[in-house]
Structure formats: structure tokens, C-alpha cells
């Protein structure tokens, strides 16, 4: 069994156990090292080739210059070894060549750096081209001093006859020393480059880790799968858009609520304005989050929120969540009929209990006439109010609300007075019964609370509701505590209230939302001497170009 596959598996297993950040770092380090080694090999090869060429040309030029010296030609012709030595020794001392050799026409040495070699034949077998063909050239051969790079040139007399040869050589060992010096000069820059690559690799791996939220790929993959399942499983419609207002994600609930038949891939990349016909909500105040606003998406009333995705203090996109208004019960149930009817029934029960107790006391005292008179008085008073409401308010939901609010006022020690001009035979088409009752109920509740907080004012609340003409007019006047000037401009904002209770701050915001939805307007004035007058103008038929 080969050890190589086993060793490879161990390395692979060890590498797989490293964190993603370290794997990226090691991979870049390995790749960088391979590249650096390849570059080193290439530079070494190029440098060696260039060095051999340059040194070879240097040896050749020296050999040609020496062989052309008239003094040397004359000395070789006379075989004057002393003269040859006197000519060559100074040159060798100034040259960087390892050796300079001079031979005769038969290749026997006339001069050599080693005197013992004089008279012997030149080694290497590469002198024939110079001696026979009178050529100058560069060769690499092994001689008496070892392998060397040598330049050879013939010595010719005045007639052109070859009478000798000059060989200038550089040993391979000397060339390798020079090559090592040149390569070593590159080691520091290459080491600096390698360290820079290591630093960049580390920074890059840290950047990748940061971009992946410090998670491993499998963790990120699992998170994306979980978020995808969560995105599709919530009951709210969810839409994600980028900074160019193009859809990047939309869940199944959103497509169902908006009656969109296209699958998600078809909607991805489309501008939100081409899919949903409510542009103000998406484009208004891009850096501000919106929460629980009543808007209309594709002619469907929804309660929507918008959350900005902020990166480097700039919005990179938004996530819009919404639910059909018909499905929202948290606000409507608390601010409309369920809570109101419970309060109204308690008020009626409380007043009837007090009345029965009073009548029982009169009967016990045998004051029958006074008991009968009280019964008739209460019956006439209540009947007048009930008859007035039944006659002037033809919507049963509104009539029931007003009767309950009348008894609730009496329970609180207040008096709800209806203006004789009250008359409602139709309601705005843009509002449902629930929304309409929420408007009136919240205005009356607000007036009750304000009146209870003002000990000096009258305890009367005046109510006018009239649908004559093209709009419904609602006017609620109280003698309560009024509106703080610091809150007057913000009284209709969600969560803004002058009450200490955490449950307040929603009613007037809801009133404004419904009125604006129906294309109406609200006027707030100070009452004299105390209190506030709220006047609402709501068109019976909504102007489609409004808002």
C-alpha cells in the first residue's frame, strides 16, 4: 500500500478541520509560495542565461583583442616565452578572467597561469575551429582548471596564416559565485514581497470573515436556509428592496395579499412602483423607519411598516412588512366595539343599579308618588335621548355607540350633549363601519379624559355629527385640560400623548390615519374658557386624486 495517498488524505482531513478564515489564508499562502518559487526559478534561469552570455562575450572580446596585439604576434612567431609572459601578465592582473592561455599553431601552450602546464597541449578539444578555420568563438569545456566558459581567437601573422591561439576563460565555479551574488540581491525584495503577500492574505481572510458575519460557510448556509423558511412561514407580507427600489425578495404571503400571480423569480429585479401602486410609502423619508401606517397597496388597505437596512450610515435597502387591515385586531378591537361595548354595558348596568336602589328606598319609605315620579322622570329623560339618537342617526352601529357613550358619560360624572343639528343618513364610502366608529369613539374618549383632568371646567361634552351636503362634519367640544402647546404640532403622531398611561397615544393617531385615508381634514381649536374643539371634515365620496 502506497504511503502517498494516506499522506494526502491526512493533509486533506487536517485542512478541512481548519476554520474558513484559516483555509483561505493557507490557500493564499500556498498559492503565493508556489508563485514565488516559480518566479525565483524563472529569474534564476534568466539571470544565469544572461550571465553566461555576457561573460562569454567578455571572454571573446578579450581573446580577440589580445590575439590582435602585434607584439604578441611577433613573440609567438619567435616562440619568445619570456616576451609572451611579459605581455600577458599585466593583462591578466587587470582582467577578471580566471585564466589567459596562449598556444602555438599546434595547440601547445606558450603561456599559462600554471607554469607547469607550459609546453603541454591545450585541453578541451575545442581549439580546431580557431587553429584550422581561423574563427573566434565561445565554448564551454573542461580543461586543466576544470569546466570553464572560454573565448577563443586565432593569432594570425601579416599574411593571415594562423600561428597560434589565445583562450580567455572563466571557470563555472566563478560564474556560479557571481550568479549567487546576483540571486542573493533579489532575496530581500522577494522576502519583503512574500511578507506583504502574507499580510494581504491575512487581511483578505479577515475581510471575508467579516463579510460572512464571522460565520463558517456551513453556518451561513444553514442561516440562509432558516431565514428563507422563516421568510416564507410568517403570516405577514414581506418585501425586501434595494437602494434602487428594486425587489430583491418577496414572500408568498405578500404575493397572496397583493393578488400577485407571478412567481417570486419573475418579480425579483422589478421596481417596486411597477408592482405596488403606493409610491409615497416607499420613497418618503428614506432614512426614517415607519411603523404601523395605514396605507393602500393595490387598492387593498393594509397596515405596513418599513425598516431601513443601514450600512456605513447610508440606506442600502428596506424591508417592508404588512398585513391586511381586516386581519389587524390589536388596535381595532381595543379602540372600537369590543372594549367600548363592554364599557357601555357596565355604565348602563351601574346607572340602572343606582336607580333601582333609589326606587327601592322610596318604596320602603312608602313614598310611592315620589318613586313613580322618579321612574317617569328617568324614563322620559332617557327616552328623549334614545329617540333623538334613533331618529337622527340612521346607522345602527353609530347609534349603538352613541347610546353607550351617553351612559358612559353619566357614569363618569359627565354629560354628553347632542347638538340639535345632528343628522346622519349616510357614511363616507371610504370608511368601514369599524373605522367610522373608531373615529367617533376615540374623539369622545379623548374628550372624556380631558374633562376629567380639568377640575375647573364644565363637565359637558358637546357633539355634532352631520352628513348634509357632500361631506360629514364631526365636531366634539369639551371643557377639559386642553392641549399642551409643546405637543400641539405632534398630537396626531403615534405614541404622543399628554396622559401618563402607556395605553394612550394611539387614538388620535388612528383618527388621523382614517381621516387622511378617506381624503378628509382635521381642525383643532381652543375652546373658551377651557378645553379643545376637534372638527373633522370627511367627504362622502373620496376624491381619487387626493393623497
UniProtKB/Swiss-Prot annotation:
Q: What Pfam families does this protein's entry cite?
A: HATPase_c (PF02518), sCache_3_2 (PF17203)
Q: What is its main location?
A: membrane
Positions annotated to bind citrate: 109, 112, 150, 152
| Membrane-spanning ranges | 24-44, 181-201
Give the consequence of mutating residue 150 to A.
Reduces citrate binding
- Top enzyme category: transferase
One term of GO molecular function: ATP binding
Q: Which residues form the PAS domain?
A: 225-264
What ranges does the Periplasmic topological domain annotation cover? 45-180
Q: What InterPro entries does the record point to?
A: HATPase_C_sf (IPR036890), His_kinase_dom (IPR005467), PAS (IPR000014), PAS-like_dom_sf (IPR035965), sCache_3 (IPR033463), Sensor-like_sf (IPR029151), Sig_transdc_His_kin-like_C (IPR004358), Sig_transdc_His_kin_SpoOB (IPR016120)
Where, in residue ranges, is this chain on the Cytoplasmic side? Answer: 1-23, 202-547
Compartmental location: Cell inner membrane
What is any one of the record's Gene Ontology cellular component terms? plasma membrane
Quote the PTM field.
Answer: Autophosphorylated.
The Histidine kinase domain covers 347-542
Task: Name the keywords, alphabetized.
Answer: ATP-binding, Cell inner membrane, Cell membrane, Kinase, Membrane, Nucleotide-binding, Phosphoprotein, Transferase, Transmembrane, Transmembrane helix, Two-component regulatory system
Q: Supply the EC number(s).
A: 2.7.13.3
In-chain residues carrying the UniProt-annotated modification Phosphohistidine: 350
Query: What is its quaternary makeup?
Result: Homodimer. In vitro CitB and the CitA kinase domain form a complex, formation of which is enhanced by ATP.
Q: What does this protein do?
A: Member of the two-component regulatory system CitA/CitB. Probably activates CitB by phosphorylation. The periplasmic domain binds H-citrate(2-), which is essential for induction of the citrate-fermentation genes.
- Protein name in the entry: Sensor histidine kinase CitA
UniProt organism field: Klebsiella pneumoniae
Amino acid at each position: 500500500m502506497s504511503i502517498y495517498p494516506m499522506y494526502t488524505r491526512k493533509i486533506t482531513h487536517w485542512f478541512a478541520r481548519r476554520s474558513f478564515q484559516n483555509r483561505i489564508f493557507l490557500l493564499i499562502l500556498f498559492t503565493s509560495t508556489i508563485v514565488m518559487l516559480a518566479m525565483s526559478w524563472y529569474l534564476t534561469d534568466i539571470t544565469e542565461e544572461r550571465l553566461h552570455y555576457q561573460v562569454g562575450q567578455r571572454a571573446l572580446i578579450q581573446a580577440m583583442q589580445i590575439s590582435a596585439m602585434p607584439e604578441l604576434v611577433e613573440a609567438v612567431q619567435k616562440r619568445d616565452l619570456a616576451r609572451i609572459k611579459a605581455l600577458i601578465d599585466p593583462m591578466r592582473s587587470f582582467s577578471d578572467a580566471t585564466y589567459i592561455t596562449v598556444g602555438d599553431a599546434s595547440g601547445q601552450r606558450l603561456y599559462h597561469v600554471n607554469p607547469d602546464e607550459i609546453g603541454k597541449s591545450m585541453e578541451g578539444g575545442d581549439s580546431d575551429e580557431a587553429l584550422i578555420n581561423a574563427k573566434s568563438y565561445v565554448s564551454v569545456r573542461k580543461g586543466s582548471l576544470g569546466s570553464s566558459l572560454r573565448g577563443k581567437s586565432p593569432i594570425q601573422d601579416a599574411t593571415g596564416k594562423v600561428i597560434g591561439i589565445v583562450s580567455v576563460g572563466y571557470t563555472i565555479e566563478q560564474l556560479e559565485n557571481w550568479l549567487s551574488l546576483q540571486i542573493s540581491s533579489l532575496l530581500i525584495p522577494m522576502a519583503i514581497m512574500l511578507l506583504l503577500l502574507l499580510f494581504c492574505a491575512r487581511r483578505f481572510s479577515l475581510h471575508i470573515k467579516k463579510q460572512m458575519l464571522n460565520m463558517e460557510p456551513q453556518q451561513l448556509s444553514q442561516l440562509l436556509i432558516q431565514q428563507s423558511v422563516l421568510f416564507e412561514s410568517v403570516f405577514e407580507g414581506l418585501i425586501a428592496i434595494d437602494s434602487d427600489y428594486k425587489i430583491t425578495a418577496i414572500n408568498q404571503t405578500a404575493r397572496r395579499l397583493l393578488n400577485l400571480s407571478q412567481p417570486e423569480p419573475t418579480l425579483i429585479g422589478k421596481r417596486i412602483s411597477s408592482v405596488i401602486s403606493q409610491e409615497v410609502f416607499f420613497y418618503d423619508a428614506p432614512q426614517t423607519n415607519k411603523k404601523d401606517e395605514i396605507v393602500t397597496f393595490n387598492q387593498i388597505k393594509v397596515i405596513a411598516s418599513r425598516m431601513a437596512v443601514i450600512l456605513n450610515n447610508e440606506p442600502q435597502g428596506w424591508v417592508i412588512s404588512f398585513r391586511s387591515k381586516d386581519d389587524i385586531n390589536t388596535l381595532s378591537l381595543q379602540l372600537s366595539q369590543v372594549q367600548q361595548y363592554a364599557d357601555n354595558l357596565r355604565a348602563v348596568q351601574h346607572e340602572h343599579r343606582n336607580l333601582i336602589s333609589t326606587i327601592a328606598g322610596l318604596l320602603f319609605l312608602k313614598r310611592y308618588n315620589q318613586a313613580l315620579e322618579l321612574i317617569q322622570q328617568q324614563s322620559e329623560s332617557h327616552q328623549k335621548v334614545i329617540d333623538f339618537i334613533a331618529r337622527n342617526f340612521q346607522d345602527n352601529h353609530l347609534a349603538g355607540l352613541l347610546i353607550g357613550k351617553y351612559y358612559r358619560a353619566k357614569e363618569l360624572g359627565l354629560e354628553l350633549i347632542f347638538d340639535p343639528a345632528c343628522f346622519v343618513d349616510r357614511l363616507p364610502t371610504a370608511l368601514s363601519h369599524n373605522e367610522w366608529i373608531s373615529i367617533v369613539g376615540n374623539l369622545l374618549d379623548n374628550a372624556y379624559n380631558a374633562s376629567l383632568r380639568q377640575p375647573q371646567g364644565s363637565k359637558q361634552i358637546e357633539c355634532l355629527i352631520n352628513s348634509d351636503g357632500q361631506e360629514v362634519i364631526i365636531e366634539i367640544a369639551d371643557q377639559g385640560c386642553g392641549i399642551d402647546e409643546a405637543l400641539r404640532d405632534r398630537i396626531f403622531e403615534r405614541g404622543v400623548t399628554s396622559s401618563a398611561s402607556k395605553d394612550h397615544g394611539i387614538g388620535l393617531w388612528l383618527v388621523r390615519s382614517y381621516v387622511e385615508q378617506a381624503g378628509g381634514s382635521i381642525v383643532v381649536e381652543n375652546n373658551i374658557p377651557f378645553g379643545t374643539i376637534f372638527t373633522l371634515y370627511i367627504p362622502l365620496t373620496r376624491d381619487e386624486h387626493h393623497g
